[in-house]
């Protein structure tokens, strides 16, 4: 008997897709399509359009994969550049081992052959030489000196005493003396000196001279010629030098002459030691004739210019003059007042010259303004 198989067109049409192929027999996409990001191969058309569409995505994908490879290689290079710490060596130091071996060999050479203890050192026993041996040297040469440790049975001689420091010579290192004085004290010393020098003026007092000085300084301050007071210890020493070398007691017969001479010294001191460039002449002028004032100034400049320069350049000379001014007040206090007679001025000038001549003294001052 035969079997008849009938196929209906409807059932066959259901199992087909519009493309004309059944679903079961549809082929899976190749592996290349998955690598292309799921893009399937387009159907081949006219003039090779399918091949050109396939080539364009492959170029893009190759560029992307190249960038990924470059980034991965850069990361590897960075990781390889990291310096790994060198592990500490756990083995013994070869230099230390070599030193240990050398120490062991040295100990073996120094010690005895069979024992492990070292031999005791031989100490020479001192012997007392005979008189003949000490007096008569051997015929072969000169007498040999005894060893330093033996000393011939006698204790070693004591070491020589240390040399004492010799006293300083009179003209050697300077002697340091502290001189302390305030501005008011130096003003009184200056007044006492002028009163003793001008012995012919019986009614002159130290306060009168200080009043002349302070009057000039106050006038310059009020008129605006200076910003600060001129009366300081250093300036008082300068004024004392000028007064000591210019004032003559036998030539000054009145207080007016003394005031004119003293104000001339003040004018030179202000011009030389003051902070301003120039000062007015009116506070320093008490006489109607200006020519006499300028003549006194020129005589003092020609005669005392080296000493004025030295007072600023040589600290030893300055301290000597400072001490002389301080001594003027002490002399007045010891005598009880300004002495009379020409012997006082002669003694004062001679003591000042003697104090300036002694160059070995160095005076250290504390100036209290």
UniProtKB/Swiss-Prot annotation:
Which residues does the annotated region (Disordered) include?
A: 1-55, 72-176, 330-369
Q: Where is the composition biased (Basic residues)?
A: 74-84
UniProt entry tagged with the keyword Manganese: no
Comp. bias regions, Low complexity: 122-144, 331-352
Q: What is this protein called?
A: Cyclin-dependent kinase 5 activator 2
* Sites bearing Phosphothreonine, chain numbering: 84
- SUPFAM superfamilies, per the entry: Cyclin-like
Q: Where is the composition biased (Polar residues)?
A: 1-11
Keywords attached to this entry? Cell membrane, Lipid-binding, Lipoprotein, Membrane, Myristate, Phosphoprotein
The organism sits in which domain of life? Eukaryota
Q: How does it assemble?
A: Heterodimer of a catalytic subunit and a regulatory subunit.
Lipidation residue positions, type N-myristoyl glycine: 2
Where is the protein situated, by its record's location annotation?
Cell membrane
Which InterPro entries does the record cross-reference, listed alphabetically? CDK5_activator, Cyclin-like_sf
* Biased amino acid composition, Basic and acidic residues: 99-112
The biological process GO terms on file are: cerebellum development; hippocampus development; layer formation in cerebral cortex; neuron migration; positive regulation of calcium ion-dependent exocytosis; regulation of cytoskeleton organization; superior olivary nucleus maturation
Q: Does the keyword DNA repair apply?
A: no
User: Which family does this protein fall into?
Assistant: Belongs to the cyclin-dependent kinase 5 activator family.
Species source reads: Mus musculus
Where composition is biased (Pro residues), the residues are 145-171
